[in-house]
Structure formats: structure tokens, C-alpha cells
Amino acid sequence: MDTIYIKSPLNYVGGKYKILDQIIPKFPKYIHTFVDLFGGGFNVGINVDADNVIYNDVIEPLCELISYFSDKSSDEVINNLEKNIEKNNLNKENTEAFLKLRNKYNHFLYSNEEEKILDFYTLILYSFNYQIRFNQNMKYNTPFGKNRSSYNQNTKKNIKKFVDKMNSINLKISKNKFIDFDFSKLEKDDFVYCDPPYLITTGSYND
């Protein structure tokens, strides 16, 4: 019987969801702590059978979003997200609302961390091809996905499955460059998965 894998609601460039059936069977049968060293959209780490999972990524907004998913129930995430979408008048065609929210996210000094995280994910859902992209100054710069990207029932189902699974695993979030990760604490049955960005390509995550 084929394994049914959970799909991340984050369309991170280089995500491995479509080839999980080729990757995960190569992992050890027993893993105490699984380290997803370049966590990204977390398609691999969320689907690994391990006692503990460490999500590591150098992009802080991603780490904060993954942590938010882990700390909230799926109902809370969905309800808060839908309220935020409505508050910001986002839809498939409202370019002005998207640009206004993107400008707010890039320049507003947030006093409420949850508001910042929800704004970030709301932007992703209405960005071109749901892509996550920052410039060298860490300003979010993905364009509007007019008539292409939006929050919909499929997205809602993905969020629910993903967050429900996250709530069931023992997860730790790490915000380190891979060279700064403390490998000295790893033990015999721990496993590190490395899928680094493709620095010699023109992928959007290299902008």
C-alpha cells in the first residue's frame, strides 16, 4: 500500500513533495531526532517518522510561520487567516490590496508578532504561483498572482492536514545558518537531511 504524504501549504521553490516516495524510503528505519537542515517548506520533515524533528532554516519569517503552525490548532490557523484575508480585502483581482499589504509587511513596525506572521502568510497565498521570495534586504518582493493565486478550499484542506500533523510531532525550531548548527548534540540514531538551495541556478530564492 502506497504511503500517503502530507503536502506543505508553502510552495517553496525546490520543494520535494512530488518525490517523497523516492527520498523517505532511503532514510534509516529508526530515527531518534531528524534534522531538516534546510527546512524550507518542510515537505520532507513533516513526513518523516522520528521521535523528534528539528526544523532549521536561516530565513526567519519562515521559521516564525512554521512555529505558528506548530503552536496553533488547525481551526485557529484557518479562522485567523480567513479574518486577516477579509480585513485586508484580498481576492484574486485586487492588485491594490495586495500591494498595500506587501508595503505594510515590508515597512510597518509590528508590535503584534501574530499579525506579522498572518500578514506574511496572507501575502504568500496571493503571490505569483504562491512563491516566497525576498530581496537582499529581506524585503518580500514576490509580485501579485492576479487571477492565479488565492486562498481556496484546496489550500484550506492542505493547511488543516499540515497543521494537524505538526501538532502531533515533537518539533523544535532552529534559526541558524547550516554552518552554525550545533551538530555536537546529535547522537547515534539521529539523522541530518541536507537539501541546500541551488546557488548556481537562477531560482527565485537566490534573488
Could you describe each region identified by the protein language model?
Residues 70:
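Conserved N-terminal glycine-rich FAD pyrophosphate-binding loop of Rossmann-like flavoproteins
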Residues 66-67:
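Conserved SAM-binding loop
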Residues 2-18, 74-193, 197-202:
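SAM-dependent nucleic-acid methyltransferase catalytic core
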Residues 63:
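Short alpha-helix immediately C-terminal to the canonical SAM-binding loop
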Residues 1-39, 43-44, 48:
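S-adenosyl-L-methionine
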Residues 23, 34-48, 55-60, 121-128, ...:
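Conserved proline-anchored active-site loop of SAM-dependent methyltransferases
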Residues 30-33, 51-52, 168-171:
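Short active-site oxyanion
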Residues 205-207:
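Short, surface-exposed loop/helix-turn segments at secondary-structure junctions
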